[in-house]
């Protein structure tokens, strides 16, 4: 049985089809779930956990960021947990929402000399970990979260996105 029930919403032009995004996100996020269960002993309910992914543009994510975080600017990814969860805690039936902005992902991928798909993979994993209570508000949290991201991405065949950088 699948651990995740992923709901996809494409709210801007330029994204792939919902079917392609669903297949891509399912592969990435199921790898993240498997990793967390195996390596971090993350508990998971027997029933699938619902997760919403919104693929949007810079303008929409800027509005969401302004409304919910008082930051009137576009960003790459926003995560909204359905319920507060500490790392290692048991998720409920609804995990939360992840919102991703296409233009920012494209721009950052170019700046980082990465493919769009590789950068999108990283941002999906990053946003997903936020739903499990991981954060990067201080150096210790950032190191833990970045380590998890790097290890999950390695399972997916991707290199360390933080190589040569200071923690967030």
UniProtKB/Swiss-Prot annotation:
Enzyme class per UniProt: hydrolase
Enzyme nomenclature, EC number: 3.1.-.-
GO cellular component: cytoplasm
Amino-acid positions noted as binding Zn(2+) in the UniProt annotation, renumbered to this chain: 126, 130, 136
Textual note on the cofactor: Binds 1 zinc ion.
Cofactors demanded by this protein: Zn(2+)
Positions in coiled-coil regions: none
An annotated GO BP: rRNA processing
Localisation: Cytoplasm
Keywords: Cytoplasm, Endonuclease, Hydrolase, Metal-binding, Nuclease, Ribosome biogenesis, rRNA processing, Zinc
GO molecular function annotations of the record: metalloendopeptidase activity; RNA endonuclease activity; zinc ion binding
Keyword NAD: no
Gene3D superfamilies reported in the protein's UniProt record: Metalloproteases ('zincins'), catalytic domain
InterPro entries: MetalPrtase_cat_dom_sf_prd, YbeY, YbeY_CS
PANTHER family xrefs: ENDORIBONUCLEASE YBEY, CHLOROPLASTIC
UniProt family annotation: Belongs to the endoribonuclease YbeY family.
Protein function: Single strand-specific metallo-endoribonuclease involved in late-stage 70S ribosome quality control and in maturation of the 3' terminus of the 16S rRNA.
NCBIfam families membership: rRNA maturation RNase YbeY
Protein name: Endoribonuclease YbeY
Lineage: Bacteria, Pseudomonadati, Pseudomonadota, Alphaproteobacteria, Hyphomicrobiales
Gene that encodes it: ybeY
